[in-house]
């Protein structure tokens, strides 16, 4: 926690906020329309924290992602006791899911 406090006091929270700013800009929405309807066809794995509200804010969105965006979805993993920052909150469990997924293709 002290690391984050030190970094935010040095840089502010600009890095984290810039993603949200850019995703809401009209110019970037037009650029992203180029990818509309394109599917991710490589094997994919969705990992999220079980306490991250983002996975639950739109019921059915994970199923829609599997059906329309990721045609080769191999799994959905929820990490217990993790929220939005799953890789920072539970790095070992996150790594284990990624390692297991990748080694299944070697």
What kind of region is each of these model predictions?
Residues 3, 15, 19, 64, ...:
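Alpha-helical elements of Rossmann-like donor-binding domains used by nucleotide-donor carbohydrate transfer enzymes
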Residues 45-82:
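Conserved loop-alpha-helix segment in the C-terminal half of the alpha/beta-hydrolase fold
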Residues 23-25, 64-68, 75, 95-98:
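Short, low-complexity, polar/charged sequence segments that are solvent-exposed and flexible
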Residues 72-106:
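Catalytic active-site module of serine/aspartate enzymes centered on a nucleophile-bearing elbow/loop
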Residues 1-58:
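Alpha/beta-hydrolase
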Residues 29-35, 66-70, 106:
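Alpha-helix termini
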């Amino acid at each position: 926690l002290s690391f984050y406090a030190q970094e935010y006091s040095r840089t502010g929270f600009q890095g984290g906020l810039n993603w949200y700013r850019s995703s809401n800009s009209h110019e970037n929405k037009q650029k992203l329309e180029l990818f509309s309807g394109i599917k991710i066809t490589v094997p994919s794995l969705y990992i999220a924290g079980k306490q991250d509200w983002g996975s639950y804010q739109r019921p059915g969105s994970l199923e829609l992602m599997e059906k329309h965006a990721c045609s080769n979805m191999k799994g959905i993993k929820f990490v217990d006791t993790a929220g939005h920052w799953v890789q920072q909150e539970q790095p070992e469990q996150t790594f284990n899911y990624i390692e297991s997924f990748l080694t299944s293709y070697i």
